[in-house]
Swiss-Prot record:
SUPFAM superfamilies: P-loop containing nucleoside triphosphate hydrolases (SSF52540). It comes from Shewanella sp. (strain W3-18-1). It catalyses: adenosine 5'-phosphosulfate + ATP = 3'-phosphoadenylyl sulfate + ADP + H(+). Belongs to the APS kinase family. It comes from the Bacteria. One of its GO terms (biological process) is sulfate assimilation. This is Adenylyl-sulfate kinase. ATP binds at residues 31-38.
Length: 205
């Protein structure tokens, strides 16, 4: 590593952010499988995109088709999966984007490690706190059935623990209220902390 030096770009994050009319951040959606992370993050991205903001959504399943296709589901591989995602998200934030990441990310240590890579205020933890009973009832991928039968081991919430955030910036239970109201709450929060400007957010339903 001694011969590797960080190359400073002629265009920095502040200039990219100014061009896009937004302050780049990473919104990290964490919660159990079936909690509604991807649905909520996807709906927020659609609303922001339609209002003219520059976004990208990193989804837990999607990154395993390419970036992390060589990884399994051991503790070590899960840690590496999130490490890679955190690094990619950091590059995207540096590019001036509002980045949304939807990952179970079950441990506080993992999430806090990613938070530590960002300046204060650029990592926004969104705890999708939908109860296990609701997630298991939804079971969109049939994973809980397999976990209960022993077909899947180390499944978060069943045979492996989920550590809920102690101080998430936002907490949303998708079993309460409708999706539009939940997205509106996220938009209002991003506006309040000056990630996005009010002129554009007036166009967001």
């Amino acid at each position: 590593m001694t011969n590797i030096v960080w190359h400073q770009h002629p265009v920095d994050q502040a200039a990219r952010a100014e061009q896009k009319g937004q302050n780049p951040v990473l919104l990290w959606f964490t919660g159990l499988s079936g909690a509604g992370k991807s649905t909520l993050a996807g709906a927020l991205e659609r609303a922001l995109f339609e209002a003219g903001f520059h976004t990208y959504l990193l989804d837990g399943d999607n990154v395993r088709h390419g970036l992390c296709k060589d990884l399994g589901f051991t503790v070590e591989d899960r840690d590496e999966n999130l490490r890679r995602v955190g690094e990619v998200a950091k590059l995207m934030v540096d590019a001036g984007l509002v980045v949304l990441s939807a990952f179970i990310s079950p441990t506080r240590e993992e999430r806090d490690g990613i938070r530590a890579r960002f300046p204060a205020g650029q990592f926004i933890e969104v705890h999708v706190s939908t109860p296990l009973s609701v997630c298991e009832q939804r079971d969109p991928k049939g994973l809980y059935v397999k976990a209960r039968s022993g077909e899947i081991s180390n499944f978060t919430g069943i045979s492996s623990p989920y550590e809920a955030p102690l101080a998430a910036e936002l907490t949303i239970d998708t079993s309460k209220g409708d999706l539009a109201t939940q997205v509106r709450a996220l938009i209002d929060y991003l506006t309040a902390i000056n990630v996005i400007n009010t002129d554009k957010t007036k166009t967001v339903a």
